[in-house]
């Protein structure tokens, strides 16, 4: 029952309070005041905002609480003035306790940056409220973080440029407020699926924005699932990365939903996609040898069509901790595919397929699969997703990806699924026969395929071994081998890849 209420609560917030309509809640302006005590938190409770520097990799160790103005305590806690400083800011909570992701992120940062200060911003008393109240509290928490940073700046060797604020969900907007209120400019803010309800479409001073730090990078992982956007959809950083389109994440699909209902843990399913942003960031810290790349694109549809796999002019970037600051000021939306678990890295390929003489096609679209054979490994049968429709007597572009590094591609096999394998194809075949019964046979002529690797930027052309045998029909396959026919082969790698 509690799990159902969790979903309905998010839905009511999103539907009942459309973006920009909230006036009584005032997340933007006079947020009561810095000494506001939210309902249900007595004056004798622990501090509403605490700064806990983690000095041990043991999650059971509470660390050392910093106190603004207490320089001696700062020294006793082992704060390193010249090192990088990370502030981890959690989001809204139903339990009133830290979730497991926070300990994983702390540990990953400690392993990656051994001399760094890792500070957890504990605002659980203000986050363990109704969602609308927690939203109102983000501003005051941001002010407290800014106050701590202003005090640290009074120390001779401390630099705001070494500060990296990492905020999850509502915590991302807390980081935005902190960057807005602090005296100076924070080095970097990372937003991990910033919360959407009550922030979508509002003014930049009321949410995370590119103005809040020298570099703001954002991961969006839960923007459209089930018609409900828990994470914010709009771009709010210098680079906004949408893994798997920013909606359905691998491992959080319909089968997982059924299992969650059966065991009464629907809240775990809901947070699977929302929390995926955190795990992608952790992955970038612990799996340095397998960095994930994202590619600039105007929208998810074009990316799914395989159009956007270029690294020219800073059009691709690492994701997570390894993301690089872009030279240009305007926002960049970027996309990538991932696996269902760590390491999340996959290998993207753009396929440009020349298709000719698609006889008696009607409105039927072929169900095509490609198998890639490489020097290191071979792929599975990879579906060629038809996002719009097949263009006849033209070049069609597709996106496929593999979970393994195939090495240098050697050959490939194209398969047209027969009607017996798919009820959908059987219906289309029957409909096509009714519209054009005089010539039910169908053929597709494919002379060559060009493959471009997103990760290496290499381009290789493949041709049919026998130019006279380039036709394919349902239930048949075609083999392609490396060639130099039509396209010039390019083996140059992107200079960007060397940044990994």
From Swiss-Prot:
Pfam families: Lipase, PLAT. Its main location: secreted. PROSITE patterns: LIPASE_SER, PLAT. Head to tail homodimer. Residues 347-482 form the PLAT domain. Exerts both phospholipase and triglyceride lipase activities. More active as a phospholipase than a triglyceride lipase. Hydrolyzes triglycerides, both with short-chain fatty acyl groups (tributyrin) and long-chain fatty acyl groups (triolein) with similar levels of activity toward both types of substrates. Hydrolyzes high density lipoproteins (HDL) more efficiently than other lipoproteins. Disulfide bonds join 64-77, 252-272, 297-316, 308-311, 463-483. Coiled coil: none annotated. Residues 1-20 form the signal peptide. It comes from the Eukaryota. One of its GO terms (biological process) is reverse cholesterol transport. Glycans are attached at residues 65, 80, 136, 359, 393, 491. Belongs to the AB hydrolase superfamily. Lipase family. The keyword Cell membrane does not apply. Keywords: Disulfide bond, Glycoprotein, Heparin-binding, Hydrolase, Lipid degradation, Lipid metabolism, Secreted, Signal. Heparin binds at residues 325-337. The keyword Chaperone does not apply. GO terms for molecular function: heparin binding; lipoprotein lipase activity; phospholipase A1 activity; phospholipase activity; triacylglycerol lipase activity. This is Endothelial lipase. It catalyses: a triacylglycerol + H2O = a diacylglycerol + a fatty acid + H(+); a 1,2-diacyl-sn-glycero-3-phosphocholine + H2O = a 2-acyl-sn-glycero-3-phosphocholine + a fatty acid + H(+); 1,2,3-tri-(9Z-octadecenoyl)-glycerol + H2O = di-(9Z)-octadecenoylglycerol + (9Z)-octadecenoate + H(+); 1,2,3-tributanoylglycerol + H2O = dibutanoylglycerol + butanoate + H(+). The active site is at residues 169, 193, 274. Expressed in placenta, lung, liver, testis and spleen.
């Amino acid at each position: 029952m509690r799990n159902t209420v969790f979903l309905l609560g998010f839905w009511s917030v999103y539907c009942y309070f459309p973006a920009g309509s909230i006036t009584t809640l005032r997340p933007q302006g006079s947020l009561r005041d810095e000494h506001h005590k939210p309902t249900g938190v007595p004056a004798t409770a622990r501090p509403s905002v605490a700064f806990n520097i983690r000095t041990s990799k043991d999650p059971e160790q509470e660390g050392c609480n910093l106190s603004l103005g207490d320089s001696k305590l700062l020294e006793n806690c082992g704060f390193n003035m010249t090192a990088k400083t990370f502030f981890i800011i959690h989001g809204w909570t139903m339990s009133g306790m830290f979730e497991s992701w926070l300990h994983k992120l702390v540990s990953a940062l400690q392993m990656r940056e051994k001399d760094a200060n890792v500070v957890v911003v504990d605002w659980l008393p203000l986050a363990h409220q109704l969602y609308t109240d927690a939203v109102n509290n983000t501003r005051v928490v941001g002010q407290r973080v800014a106050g701590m940073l202003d005090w640290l700046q009074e120390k001779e060797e401390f630099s705001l440029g070494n500060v990296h604020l990492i905020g999850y969900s509502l915590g991302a907007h807390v980081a935005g407020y902190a960057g807005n209120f602090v005296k100076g400019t924070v080095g970097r803010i990372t937003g991990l699926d910033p919360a959407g309800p009550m922030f979508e479409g509002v003014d930049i001073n009321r949410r995370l924005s590119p103005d809040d730090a020298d570099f703001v990078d954002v991961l969006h992982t839960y923007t459209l699932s089930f018609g409900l956007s828990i994470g914010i959809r709009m771009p709010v950083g210098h680079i906004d990365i949408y893994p798997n389109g920013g909606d359905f994440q691998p491992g959080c699909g319909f089968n997982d939903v059924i299992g969650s209902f059966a065991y009464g843990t629907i809240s775990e399913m809901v947070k699977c996609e929302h929390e995926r942003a955190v795990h992608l960031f952790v992955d970038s810290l612990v799996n340095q040898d397998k960095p994930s790349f994202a590619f600039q694109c105007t929208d998810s549809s074009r990316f799914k069509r395989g159009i956007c796999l270029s690294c020219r002019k800073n059009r691709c970037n690492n994701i997570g901790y390894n993301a690089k600051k872009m030279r240009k000021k305007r926002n960049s939306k970027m996309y990538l595919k991932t696996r269902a678990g760590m390491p999340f890295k996959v290998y993207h390929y753009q396929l440009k397929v020349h298709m000719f003489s698609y006889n008696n096609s009607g409105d039927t679209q072929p169900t095509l699969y490609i198998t890639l054979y490489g020097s290191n490994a071979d792929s599975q049968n990879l579906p060629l997703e038809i996002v719009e429709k097949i263009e006849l007597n033209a070049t069609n572009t597709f996106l496929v990806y593999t979970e393994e590094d195939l090495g240098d591609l050697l050959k490939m096999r194209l398969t047209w699924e027969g009607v017996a394998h798919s009820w959908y194809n059987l219906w289309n075949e029957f409909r096509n026969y009714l519209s054009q019964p005089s010539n039910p046979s169908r053929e597709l002529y494919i002379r060559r395929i060009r493959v471009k690797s997103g990760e290496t930027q290499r381009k290789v052309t493949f041709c049919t071994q026998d130019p006279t045998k380039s036709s394919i029909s349902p239930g048949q396959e075609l083999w392609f081998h490396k060639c130099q026919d039509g396209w010039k082969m390019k083996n140059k790698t992107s200079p960007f890849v060397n940044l990994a």
